[in-house]
């Protein structure tokens, strides 16, 4: 059992009590909500005559169903418009902060909370979205939850949870040129598997993470859930504090100094005990691309689709399904695979540093004939900052479409969808069957820079050849 880790310290400091089931009743410091998983939760509160207990600890935005082109109301999609009206009504009725379209603060929930300073070290955070683990980059313990749990947090500001084990994932060294945070987490998931983290929280540590920016750390923690871990986190340090200082909701004045003292105290102890430890060498991590139908089916961009005999016996059945669905043959090079659509964005890779790296590849080049490529900033703030730097002009000159903020084609609950058997190069987090809007559409996950390279070449391409 882990002891002396950040996870233990934050968990213990937020424990309200132990339940007869053996679970912990955990206080939730920040509850983030959006338009998809909150309407039913609010309806259940109304049915029981309950109010939101701590509206000041609840923040809402719209992201999943938001069009990234025509955002005029009412939306063309009736269901999307209904969801918009519901979250507008629910937040107004309950006195909850709501970052609506055009407010300057709207965007993907896991992008806007950090950029506003809402996400802070030592917090417990919940959201009705799988990728809530993103916020662990700040040294928070953040859980994705279902609609019934959204209801519970709204009503009681607590969750009933079983305590997780803690796995230390140590990555040391400097990443090679052309290798990014996205490659790090895809490599980890490829190695440990999509179920390898079940029952665990992942603590990401080592000199590689110390060298990362906060946005890079967010990319890694975002996809901890794809490796089966309920949450992932990085211990807060000077990089964390510098990022937070001066942001809208960050502590100010004397409160800032008090916060720093607390944040430093929750760092995992030097002699902390872990339930498992895994180590990686940063120098050995390549630009990585998924070839199959889970984020764990990944290979280096210069490798071939693995053959069944190269796999563990338990992985072969899923691989056979992936070969058929993706129309890729064992032994086939992934480089050179034709691409139809290129998507840069999402809560994984829709931040400024992601757009800057992609723009470096796009600048002075042009999207290949027959390829549809578009860039979706993770928030309205990111969009404005990118435009101030001229990134929009670089992308547009290269033939990319420049869109409004939203989840877009990460999950296609909006107009941005694949058509038929199209195959996409995507900077998002999931490559499940039908994930991007077409029941037969195919997705290859990779870093934003790799997506930009694929857009230019028209095929999966090693980004290092364009640097």
Feature-to-residue mapping (PLM):
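Fe-S-dependent hydro-lyases/dehydratases of central metabolism
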Residues: 1-467
């Amino acid at each position: 059992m882990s002891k002396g880790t950040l996870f233990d310290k934050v968990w213990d400091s937020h424990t309200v009590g132990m339940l007869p089931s053996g679970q912990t009743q955990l206080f939730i410091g920040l509850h983030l909500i959006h338009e998809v998983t909150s309407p039913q939760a609010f309806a259940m509160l109304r049915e029981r005559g309950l109010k939101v207990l701590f509206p000041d600890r609840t923040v809402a935005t719209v992201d999943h169903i938001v069009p990234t082109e025509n955002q005029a109301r009412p939306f063309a999609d009736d269901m999307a418009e209904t969801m918009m009206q519901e979250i507008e009504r629910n937040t107004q009725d309950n006195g909850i902060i709501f970052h609506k379209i055009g407010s300057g603060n709207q965007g993907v929930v896991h992008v806007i909370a950090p950029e506003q300073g809402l996400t802070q070290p030592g917090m417990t955070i919940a959201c009705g979205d799988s990728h809530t683990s993103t916020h662990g980059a700040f040294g928070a313990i953040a859980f994705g939850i279902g609609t019934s749990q959204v209801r519970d947090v709204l009503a009681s500001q607590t969750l009933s949870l079983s305590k997780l084990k803690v796995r230390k994932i140590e990555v040391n060294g400097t990443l090679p040129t052309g290798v990014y945070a996205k490659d790090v987490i895809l490599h980890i998931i490829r190695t440990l598997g999509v179920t390898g983290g079940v029952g665990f929280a992942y603590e990401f540590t080592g000199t590689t993470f110390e060298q990362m920016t906060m946005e890079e750390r967010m990319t890694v923690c975002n996809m901890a859930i794809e490796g089966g871990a309920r949450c992932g986190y990085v211990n807060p340090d000077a990089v964390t504090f510098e990022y937070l200082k001066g942001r809208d909701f960050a502590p100010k004045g004397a409160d800032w100094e008090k916060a720093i003292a607390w944040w430093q105290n929750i760092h995992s102890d030097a002699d902390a005990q872990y339930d498992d430890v895994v180590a990686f060498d940063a120098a050995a991590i390549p630009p990585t691309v998924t070839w199959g139908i889970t984020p764990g089916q990944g290979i280096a961009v210069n490798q071939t689709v693995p053959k069944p005999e190269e796999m563990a016996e338990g992985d072969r059945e899923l691989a056979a399904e992936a070969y058929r669905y993706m129309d890729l043959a064992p032994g086939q090079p992934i480089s050179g695979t034709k691409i139809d659509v290129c998507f840069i964005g999402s809560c994984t890779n829709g931040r400024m540093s992601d757009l800057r790296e992609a723009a470096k590849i796009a600048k002075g080049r042009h999207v290949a004939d027959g390829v549809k490529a578009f860039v979706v900033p993770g928030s309205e703030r990111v969009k404005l900052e990118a435009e101030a730097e001229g990134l929009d002009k670089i992308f547009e000159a290269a033939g990319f479409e420049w869109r409004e903020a939203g989840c877009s084609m990460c999950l296609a609950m909006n107009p941005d969808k694949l058509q038929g058997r199209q195959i996409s190069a995507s900077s998002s987090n999931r490559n499940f069957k039908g994930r991007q809007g077409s029941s037969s559409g195919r997705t290859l996950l990779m870093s934003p820079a790799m997506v930009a390279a694929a857009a230019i070449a028209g095929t999966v391409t090693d980004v290092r050849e364009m640097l």
